[in-house]
């Protein structure tokens, strides 16, 4: 018996140990070969895989549904500190064992703390998939979290904070986040502050680990030379399937609202340029207008051919770097323009940026620009799917954000369906600089 819902096909014969294996990407008849498979295990672990023909490697990752967005002001940076601390040793591996485990096999191991998730990722030859699953399983489930290691790792993170503060085009984004989101966790620094990092203790790390690092809050994804049943067997042998579901009490996150338009300046006389971020609330991940937003954002500041690059750099020569940025989250987004210019030309450069943005916000894009933008976005989407790591991340986001998995053809159809009315709508709503928060850093303020 086969039950079909949209582009998801579940076949009773595919059930393993009472757990349905879902093939995503097939048509309703099941005739098309699926490109992604998903299994939700009884202990709450979500497992996704995508076999990539011709690949000889596998990207394997685990995402924890806990990060900066779920922290209190007093514990700002605890998610990032825990991500560091798991590498200091586990029940089976020393810190050196972890460092050598995959690199000596020609692979790589890394971790990232983001606003909504913390991820642990590996890239290995296909024959070493089990090694990757074992090592990341140890990091996620069995860290030692020792007091002596914490004292050392605090010093490392304080150095990381200093490095960011010494890099103007890094620190200005932290300043802008605080200006845009205020006291909401969206405005927190992922690294934390010096005071919060110094105050965090082992009890804080153990409490976060106990609450969040369990199968019920985990998504595992793999892409490359991997079969779904093979991945499930590897996870079973590595002990992932025997772990208890864990505490599923939701994290309390207050609704977010962006600050109104205003300007802030951080005086820095020790740098030679004024760094500027002009930005505001962006589009949420699940907003169906996301692709129209992407086209406007890309044509405004997405490359050498963009309106801002051509105007500010090529025509006026006022900046070396000028570009747009965009981050989408489950509940909101953040986007804007970054540029850096000499103190005596920074205001002129900012005025030019505003002029271009006003034009886009008022008029949207011409039909020729929209056609070119669609063509460019289609190309970027396809190119982004060439690597197994990017495909792994795309697979994980289907579970993390509750998004349907879309084949390349389906994505191309969504891009092609973007119309001028939707473009004008998102341009008016999101790209008017008069609604944005302005932050500058350098010897001289702009307004």
Model-assigned labels for residue ranges:
Residues 258-262:
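Internal nucleotide-binding/catalytic subdomain
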Residues 44, 51-102, 288-300, 308-312:
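Active/ligand-binding-proximal structured segments within catalytic/core domains
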Residues 80, 84, 228, 275:
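Histidine-centered active-site/metal-ligand motif
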Residues 1-22, 34, 40, 51, ...:
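Charge-rich, well-structured scaffold segments of protease-associated domains
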Residues 278:
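A domain-level signal for the structural core that forms small-molecule/cofactor-binding pockets
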Residues 29-31:
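Short loop/turn motifs at secondary-structure junctions and domain boundaries
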């Amino acid at each position: 018996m086969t039950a079909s819902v949209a582009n998801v096909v579940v076949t009773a014969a595919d059930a393993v140990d009472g757990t349905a294996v879902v093939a995503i990407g097939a048509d309703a008849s099941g005739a098309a070969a699926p490109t992604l498979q998903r299994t939700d295990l009884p202990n709450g672990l979500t497992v996704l895989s995508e076999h990539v023909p011709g690949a000889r490697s596998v990207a394997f990752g685990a995402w924890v549904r806990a990060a900066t967005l779920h922290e209190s002001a007093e514990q700002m940076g605890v998610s990032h500190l825990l991500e560091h601390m798991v590498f200091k040793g586990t029940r089976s591996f020393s810190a050196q064992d972890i460092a050598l485990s995959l690199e000596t096999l020609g692979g790589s191991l890394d971790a990232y703390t983001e606003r909504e998730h913390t991820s642990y990722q590996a890239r290995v030859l296909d024959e070493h998939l089990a090694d990757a699953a074992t090592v990341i399983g140890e990091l996620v489930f069995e860290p030692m979290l020792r007091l002596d290691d914490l004292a050392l790792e605090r010093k490392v993170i304080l150095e990381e904070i200093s490095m960011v503060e010494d890099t103007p085009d890094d620190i200005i984004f932290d300043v802008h986040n605080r200006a845009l989101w205020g006291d909401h966790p969206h405005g927190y620094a992922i690294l934390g502050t010096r005071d919060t990092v110094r105050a965090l203790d082992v009890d804080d790390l153990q409490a976060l680990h106990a609450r969040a690092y369990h199968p019920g809050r985990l998504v595992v994804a793999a892409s490359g030379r991997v079969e779904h049943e093979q991945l499930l067997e590897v996870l079973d042998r590595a002990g992932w399937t025997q772990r208890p579901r864990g505490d599923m009490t939701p994290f309390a996150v207050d609704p977010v609202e962006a600050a109104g338009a205003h300007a802030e300046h951080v005086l820095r006389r020790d740098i030679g340029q004024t760094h500027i971020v002009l930005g505001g609330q962006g589009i949420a991940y699940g907003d169906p207008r996301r692709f129209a937003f992407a086209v406007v954002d890309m044509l405004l500041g997405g490359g050498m051919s963009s309106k801002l690059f051509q105007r500010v750099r090529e025509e006026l020569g006022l900046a070396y770097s000028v570009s747009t940025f965009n981050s989408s989250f489950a509940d909101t987004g953040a986007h804007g323009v970054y540029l850096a210019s000499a103190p005596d030309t920074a205001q002129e450069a900012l005025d030019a940026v505003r002029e271009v943005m006003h034009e886009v916000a008022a008029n949207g894009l011409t039909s020729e620009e929209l056609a070119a933008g669609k063509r460019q976005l289609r190309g970027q989407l396809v190119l982004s799917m060439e690597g197994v790591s990017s495909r792994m991340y795309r697979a994980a986001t289907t579970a993390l954000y509750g998004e349907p998995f879309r084949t390349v053809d389906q994505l191309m159809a969504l891009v092609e369906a973007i119309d001028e009315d939707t473009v004008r709508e998102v341009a008016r709503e999101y790209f008017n600089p008069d609604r944005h928060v302005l932050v500058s850093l350098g010897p001289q303020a702009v307004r």
